[in-house]
Amino acid sequence: MARIAGIDLPREKRIVVGLTYIFGIGNSLSRVILKKAGIDESIRVKDLNESQEAAIRKALEESAKVEGDLRSEIQLNIKRLMDIGCYRGLRHRRGLPVNGQRTRTNARTRKGGKKTVANKKKVTK
């Protein structure tokens, strides 16, 4: 199993798909990295040799932040928004949608589970 950027890539998948298992690498960036490394996209992960893995690691370091570095940068950006007190920072702080989505209905992913409000009891005679 090839281990790149601290992630074990699935052996049976093509390398262009396997690289997308790394946080921060999508389809297009995967293709760019393979082109820089000079590796064919159709090769399987199990067929990579050590020199090809090293070339991928080198191309990856040159091109993008991935995994832990990227996650920490995103967290720092969110923290900065909260510290400066801008609208997006307030939305993050309150746990509400940030990008202008509606909140009257939906928004359950961001707000969490439904909070049920009890109705008033009807008095029976």
Swiss-Prot record:
InterPro entries per UniProt: Rbsml_uS13_C, Ribosomal_uS13, Ribosomal_uS13-like_H2TH, Ribosomal_uS13_bac-type, Ribosomal_uS13_CS
Keyword RNA-binding in record: yes
A GO MF label: tRNA binding
Any Pfam family hit: Ribosomal_S13
GO cellular component terms listed in the entry, alphabetical order: cytosol; small ribosomal subunit
Keyword rRNA-binding found: yes
Superkingdom, natural source: Bacteria
PROSITE patterns named in the record: RIBOSOMAL_S13_1, RIBOSOMAL_S13_2
Region named Disordered: 95-125
GO BP: any one term: translation
Keywords of this entry: Ribonucleoprotein, Ribosomal protein, RNA-binding, rRNA-binding, tRNA-binding
Extent of Basic residues compositional bias: 105-125
HAMAP family found in the cross-reference section: Ribosomal_uS13 (MF_01315)
Record-linked NCBIfam families: uS13_bact
Family named by the database record: Belongs to the universal ribosomal protein uS13 family.
Subunit structure: Part of the 30S ribosomal subunit. Forms a loose heterodimer with protein S19. Forms two bridges to the 50S subunit in the 70S ribosome.
Function: Located at the top of the head of the 30S subunit, it contacts several helices of the 16S rRNA. In the 70S ribosome it contacts the 23S rRNA (bridge B1a) and protein L5 of the 50S subunit (bridge B1b), connecting the 2 subunits; these bridges are implicated in subunit movement. Contacts the tRNAs in the A and P-sites.
Protein name from the UniProt record: Small ribosomal subunit protein uS13
